[in-house]
Amino acid sequence: GGMVRNVRAENLSAALINEILERHPEVNPDEVEDVIWGCVNQTKEQGFNIARFISLMTPLPHRCAAQTVNRLCASSMTAIHSAAMAIMSGQGEVFFCGGVEHMGHVPMDHGVDPNPSSSLFSAKASGMMGLTAEMVAIQHRVSREDQDSFAFRSHQRASKSTTSGRFSREIVGVEGHDQEGHLQFCLEDEVIRHDAKLDEIAALKPVFNPVSGPVTAGTSSA
């Protein structure tokens, strides 16, 4: 597991809201109209309107509303859209928007029972992003070499931006545990490979189509 394997989804999100309020004392918690949080697999610790449980762990008043929205990968974006529409229609002025998905605690397919006949009405591999990437690579002729080079450049850019502090205003540190179980304060994305090497990425085996697929762990997002 990763750094936050022992931290629940609600705690992760509550820490974010608490830090934002701490960084921006000009924001009055009493003026927050709604907490709108995106989440796809709304079960276990992410169930029963996780946005409400997150809100209760912050200085926001109990009268502040909270809702959890689901539009799969666009859930957090939909949360922002919903808040924007509410502001434009005069239903409030201050909102907290975000999203959470703790796949270490709630796996992507946990409790999911897709209808087999739905494949008759949807695109091939539309239910799995890994195979979708494989199909896109075939349709648009994106070679393995191009993908590896793109991934390598992404790690280089992420490393440079992180070490130079470009993301410091966008990241809220949280307590977690390293691989040895020691308590540690996490201040950066732990999947960035600061020492990434193109030849090592090129040597990785495909994970979604093991026969001839070009997509590997090195070219997949975390």
Regions found by a protein language model. Give the residues of each.
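Generic N-terminal amphipathic, Lys/Arg-enriched alpha-helix
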Residues: 1-3
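Conserved catalytic cysteine-centered active-site region
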Residues: 7, 29, 39-93, 123-134, ...
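Residues that line or immediately flank small-molecule/substrate-binding pockets and catalytic motifs
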Residues: 39, 99, 178
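Flexible glycine-/small-residue-enriched beta->alpha junction loops
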Residues: 88-140
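N-terminal extracellular/periplasmic Venus flytrap/periplasmic-binding protein-like
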Residues: 5-6, 10-15, 26, 146-222
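Active-site-proximal alpha-helical scaffold in enzymes
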Residues: 69-100, 137-167
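Short, well-ordered amphipathic alpha-helical segments that serve as non-catalytic structural scaffolds
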Residues: 9-24, 50-54, 79, 129-136, ...
